[in-house]
Amino acid sequence: MTLMTKFLGAVAATALSAGAALAEPALIFDLGGKFDKSFNEAAFGGAQRWAKETGNTFREIELQSEAQREQALRRFAEAGSNPIIMTGFAFGDALGQVAGDYPDTDFVIIDMVVDAPNVRSVVFNEHEGSYLVGMMAAMASKTNTVGFIGGMDIPLIRKFACGYAQGVKAANPDATVISNMTGTTPAAWNDPVKGSELTKAQISQGADVVYA
């Protein structure tokens, strides 16, 4: 598990604690499920740790479609869950529609900013960590060619890619950076076959270090 996912688990645990005295909190996982070996799973791990340490419980739901985002938010808010935590930027639009209808409910969203008094937005300087990864990749590479593979092609993932490329160039100005995304729709987050194909393609082009 990466440092970022470990930190996300800590964020989830902290966010749950913020409303523990108010009501049973809720955690809404993004598409991909709570065992995605990524952000969802990190958040689930943090929530489990919080439950074990405090003896409290939390509600949860794994979404099956985009249409369920607003539905899940309203369902938990109506049930009195507080706070309600979402594990990804894709909840932004739905939360913008819902937050104002439940002013006494606290919401937490990760990787997106929603400007509302009852919303806590958790964002990261992704490019900074990726810059350091890029420097290490350049120093480790023996071919002077390294790769980057992102998920859905969105500004957030481009921040990872940009920081990585700049770190590579800082350590080795002559290095080549090959960059690919697995797709342009949410399905890109759960496409290991495409990720494998892109990795093999980058290796065939000389990349001996790939950041994904």
Model-derived regions, located:
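A residue-level marker of the well-folded mature domains of exported/periplasmic proteins
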Residues: 23-212
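Gram-negative bacterial Sec-dependent N-terminal signal peptides
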Residues: 1-23
